[in-house]
Regions:
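Conserved inter-motif catalytic segment of the P-loop NTP-binding fold
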Residues: 1-88, 148, 161-164, 169, ...
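Hydrophobic beta-strand residues in large extracellular and virion-surface proteins
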Residues: 28-30, 45, 143, 157, ...
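DNA transaction DNA-binding modules
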Residues: 157-212
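Phosphate-binding/switch region of NTP-binding enzymes
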Residues: 4, 57, 77-165
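Conserved, well-folded catalytic cores of nucleic-acid-processing
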Residues: 16, 20-23, 66-69, 89, ...
Length: 212
């Protein structure tokens, strides 16, 4: 994973990372400086992906930091072009690029209309997610999801301060709500182990010894 934290310092990144974990994955990379779209960003990302071929996700935080403006007087065309450049790069290298972007301060009946900029941004992406807090600092929010290959969903979330994660507060409509008890036991067991190396048979034996 490559995370472009373009609004943070390395000290702030380190502080936040230590709040989440004491053992960050070796495959997690950070950068605080990047060129703009059409001004070297594509080459920088391509070089990184060549050096780290196992990369599957690039996070750009925020989108505005890599935009360079245009002489064109068509904002929609500018927005669509910028996103299309990044999408082409993602498709070429078979990775996902997650763009963090600001919302308008004005509410809208359609959450997707709250994405700052024109509809050229949401129109060029594969998927769009809008996280809208019930009120600032409440820790309660709804994640609105839409995309070309996913159904529209509204997911109620609550922020878990102990793990610095957003958690789903109720089952997603239409999904299976009953979970195999053995799957629950296995999940809890693996969380307790932290990590495991071995065969499926060895894992099964450990689980049986633990649960009886």
């Amino acid at each position: 994973v490559l995370y472009l934290c373009l609004e943070d310092s390395l000290t702030r990144i380190q502080s936040r990372l230590f709040q989440i974990t004491d053992d960050a994955p070796e495959a997690l990379h950070f950068a605080t400086i990047a060129a703009g779209i059409g001004e070297g960003l594509e080459e920088q990302l391509t070089n990184f992906l060549t050096q780290h071929p196992d990369t599957s996700l690039v996070v750009i935080d925020t989108l505005q930091r890599i935009r360079t403006g245009s002489d064109s007087g068509n904002p929609y065309a500018n927005d669509y072009r910028d996103i299309s450049v990044l999408k082409a790069l993602a498709d070429k290298h078979h990775i996902a690029i997650l763009l963090i972007h600001h919302l308008r301060k004005m509410n809208d009946d359609d959450p997707m209309n709250m994405i700052s900029g024109t509809t050229g941004i949401s129109g060029a992406t594969d998927s769009n997610f809008v996280l809208k807090e019930r009120r600032r600092g409440s820790g309660e929010a709804t994640l609105y999801c839409t995309g070309r290959d996913i159904e529209y969903r509204e997911l109620p979330l609550v922020f878990d301060k102990s793990g610095y994660t957003w958690r789903l507060t109720e089952p997603v409509e239409g999904e299976r709500t009953s979970i195999d008890p053995e799957a629950i036991s296995l999940s809890a067991f693996l969380r307790g182990l932290g990590s495991f190396e071995g065969t499926a048979t060895e894992l099964s034996a450990l689980l049986e010894a633990q649960t009886g």
